[in-house]
Design a protein with these regions (language model features):
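Short glycine-rich anion-binding loops that position phosphate/pyrophosphate groups of nucleotides
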Residues: 23-26, 69, 94-97
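Short alpha-helical oligomerization interface
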Residues: 33-41
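Active-site oxyanion/phosphate-handling segment shared across diverse enzymes
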Residues: 143-195
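A short, N-terminal amphipathic alpha-helix
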Residues: 45-64, 78-82
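Short beta->alpha junction loops
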Residues: 64-70, 173-174
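N-terminal nucleotide-binding beta1-loop-alpha1 segment
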Residues: 1-30
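Short aromatic/basic micro-patch
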Residues: 41, 98, 138, 178-179
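Conserved beta-loop-beta/alpha segment of the NTase-like Rossmann-fold superfamily
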Residues: 72-148
Length: 195
């Protein structure tokens, strides 16, 4: 786990970012990829390195879960078990290389007063009702027992509905831009060049 960066506005009792990097990346390989999607190059750095750089820039504590678990639920449970004293958790799939540090901090700040925080991105010109759920999803310490009991591929959907969850609007297309296929990687490359 990384320590906090004192130059950032870190929320009191900051949650730990759980970077989930356990997946096999089969869709990426099936789409023509020649390496694991997290090792694919995007603007001269790997997809994983972009995600790590954003997390490090946020100043929040973090943990990478890359042990090769069979499902997302198993990965989340393992990561929470390795960070038992965290004030909460931001669950961030490692294949979101365009996520912005400010988004991580925005979710962390909102988590201070809520059990679960669901970031949502609204595309330009769209109404808030058309918001797309994104990442990272924030979970307060109150969710710990349920997160530790997760398994399989469903992730934390069951935990989300068991607690009071709020939606927040984030101004970050990176919160919904994951890399699952070679086409996704090409789209991310175009978006990265436009920054």
């Amino acid at each position: 786990m990384q320590t906090e960066n004192p130059t950032k506005k870190i929320p009191k009792n900051a949650p730990t970012v759980l970077i989930l990097a356990s997946g096999r990346g089969e869709r990426f390989l099936a789409s023509g990829g020649t390496t694991h999607k997290l090792q694919a190059l995007l603007g001269g750095k790997t997809v994983l390195q972009h995600t790590l750089d954003a997390v490090k820039a946020s100043g929040l504590p973090w943990h990478v879960e890359d042990a090769g678990h069979p499902g997302m639920g198993d990965s989340i449970a393992a990561a929470v078990s390795k960070t038992p004293d965290a004030a909460g958790w931001l669950v961030l799939p490692a294949d979101l290389p365009l996520i912005q540090p400010a988004t991580l901090l925005q979710v962390a700040e909102a988590l201070g007063a809520n059990d679960v925080v669901l970031p949502c991105f609204v595309r330009d010109g769209a109404h808030e009702e058309a918001a797309q759920r994104g990442h990272p999803v924030g979970f307060g310490a109150v969710c710990k027992k349920d997160l530790l009991n997760l398994s399989g591929n469903k992730g934390a959907a069951g935990v989300i509905v068991s607690y009071t969850a709020i939606k927040i609007i984030v101004n970050d297309v990176g919160s919904v831009t994951d890399v699952d296929t070679v086409d996704d990687l090409l789209r991310a490359e175009t978006m990265l060049k436009m920054r």
